[in-house]
Amino acid sequence: MSPTVTVQLTDDTAKRFEGHAKLLAIGTATPTNWVDQATYPDFYFRITNSERLLEHKEKFRRICNKSKIRFRHLVLTEELLKKSPNLCTYNDASLNTRQDILVSEVPKLGKEAAMKAIKEWGRPISEITHLVFCTTSGVDMPGADFQLTKLLGLNSSVKRLMMYQQGCNAGAAMLRLVKDLAENNKGARVLVVCSEITINIFRGPSLEQDDNLLAQCLFGDGSAAMIVGKDPRPGLETPLFELVSSAQTIVPNTDSHLKLTLREMGLTFHCSRAVPSVLAENVEDCLVKAFEPYGISDWNSIFWVFHPGGYAIVDRVEERLGLGPERLRASRDVLSEYGNLTSACVLFILDEMRKKSKKDEQ
């Protein structure tokens, strides 16, 4: 005979589910080293000893020009690459070299963004109850969440969660996850950190793999942090955004279009030419499922924090939905000034939007 469990929703439990999570602070950080996209092809082919590949170099230059990215911040410097020549070939075994750099640098870059968010929040660091750390690379145990706990001096009792290898999906996924944590843990103040360093994907050119050139042109390094909680304390905390609902949709038969695979040579990248059109063709169905419960069907009536995988994606989605030029402006600006920051990108865009809103109010 199966046991029977009776659960009663008490007044205290009911209150726990009232109200939405609020984003209370945002901080961003980038490495001091940066590259100009206009001159990057010359640097890239020189540092990888590939200047003899003239046609390939010109092809890469065209890709960089079409990307509409102006600058990218990178941890990788010429000095570091000269010390690690195995990073500059296409397929030499180099995972150990990459890991040694990432395991050290990812938490440090995350700390910079976290400190800015904590400073803006204005509350004692001891009030942070949860930490969620996200990165696409640098897998280690204890993880970057543990290292950041030490770097920041968080309470030893802080509840930690480490998310590895989530890629561009992770920015929105972190918002969804932190909403659940903040709303279902009374008094929670959750620190979320997305720290991305693209060393794992850097490598020399290959005559057979054009996808690799796109990867070398597209991704930048950066970290972003946010503090989220429910029921902000008047006069002590200032909410920036309200997280009303979250949704996620898998588009069937699309998993072959975008793939990243961790190998001895680092993280390999495949992106089919169909990605922009596949996203554009399916985005409205996803929006309908997410916004229909709220009676919203005018896509120009809402503000957009759209992850800009690349300019072709932004252009196709904008055209498909008939969006005005200002709807995706923040996404375009972040892509132009930083490149694709994978999980950190969405938080950079949120930061850009709140800054613009504050400026408009003035």
Curated annotation (Swiss-Prot):
GO biological process, one term: polyketide biosynthetic process
UniProt keywords, alphabetically: Acyltransferase, Flavonoid biosynthesis, Transferase
Top-level taxonomic group: Eukaryota
Annotated metabolic or biological route of this protein: Secondary metabolite biosynthesis; flavonoid biosynthesis
Family annotation (PROSITE patterns): CHALCONE_SYNTH
CDD domains: CHS_like (cd00831)
InterPro entries: Chalcone/stilbene_synt_C, Chalcone/stilbene_synt_N, Chalcone/stilbene_synthase_AS, Polyketide_synthase_type-III, Thiolase-like
Reactions catalysed according to its record: (E)-4-coumaroyl-CoA + 3 malonyl-CoA + 3 H(+) = 2',4,4',6'-tetrahydroxychalcone + 3 CO2 + 4 CoA
Pfam families: Chal_sti_synt_C, Chal_sti_synt_N
Positions annotated as active site in the UniProt record: C168
GO MF entries: naringenin-chalcone synthase activity
EC number(s) per entry: 2.3.1.74
Purpose: The primary product of this enzyme is 4,2',4',6'-tetrahydroxychalcone (also termed naringenin-chalcone or chalcone) which can under specific conditions spontaneously isomerize into naringenin.
Protein family: Belongs to the thiolase-like superfamily. Chalcone/stilbene synthases family.
Name assigned to this protein: Chalcone synthase A
Name of encoding gene: CHSA
